[in-house]
Amino acid sequence: IGKLDSVEVLGFVDNNKSVDWIAECGGHVINLLAKGSYKHCTQQLKMSPEEHLAHIKQTIDYALSKGFTVNLYLEDWSSGMRDSRDYLFMMMDELVKLPIKRFLLPDTLGILNPLQCVEYMRQMVRRYPNSHFDFHAHNDYDLAVSNSLAAVLSGAKGLHVTVNGLGERCGNAPLASVQVILKDMFGAKTNIKEDRLNDISRLVEGYSGIAVAPNTPVVGDNVFTQVAGVHADGDNKDKLYCNDLVPERFGRHREYALGKNSGKANIIQNLNELGLELTPEQTKAVTKRITEL
């Protein structure tokens, strides 16, 4: 209740069908999917750019008549910038005249690297300085996080991320990773409650049935577990092996695993958690036995 204006629903240029069903469901915001590359326009839609543009304008006019806020996806934008920039700029030159709140720029095929992302985003921002651009990364080359950061540092005002990086094919940029990098390395402020990141990750993991890798930054099971004895020893001595990603920040706590690489410091940390205290000789004996196991 009271949050409907925050719910954005994907819709299509489909003779107003999407607008109608979103309205029937009580929605107020449509993220309209248009084509950002000449190839998508002519080969998938079988339309000329002029025909596609006319259909987009008609759909937007209809959505506005229903009281909608309109955002616009330019699907395959990255390919459009690479292969058919004249088409893309022709479309944008007309679209910026319309009351579109945000333009959503996806790297649909996950083909960009950060240098390309900087180049393309800067061109968009310079050519259309009064427009709001979001960037939507895909992770096919494992560059979704890097490209998202490149985009925002080049003028993008919004980033599309997903919990646990879930998404088509290799997924999208993971929320937790993007959040901590923006905050810690660039001083960005968001409304993300970091102490809930682990909870929402587990919730989505449960509903999706897609397990989170144990070494996933921030939310993986093992990322706050120290195994090497030298690390545990350093933590005992002014937290020498800690960075800004302290587990308490995310509602978690650090653990010290026991194994063949464990040292006396690991044993002491675990004993402290259990409220136990051993003599130096006993600690040495326990450490020896643990490493043998």
Residue ranges and their predicted role:
Residues 136-164:
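Small-aliphatic-rich amphipathic alpha-helix that forms the alpha element of a beta-alpha
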Residues 167-193, 197:
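C-terminal helical cap(s) of enzyme catalytic domains, especially alpha/beta-barrels
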Residues 37-40, 142, 165-170:
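Short gly/pro/ser/thr-enriched loop/turn and capping motifs at secondary-structure boundaries
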Residues 187-293:
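A mid-to-C-terminal "edge-of-domain" accessory segment
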Residues 9-14, 132-145, 168:
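Glycine-rich beta-to-alpha transition loops that act as phosphate-gripper elements at the mouths
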Residues 1-16, 258, 262:
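N-terminal capping/small domains of soluble enzymes
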Residues 15-131, 149-156:
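Alpha/beta enzyme core
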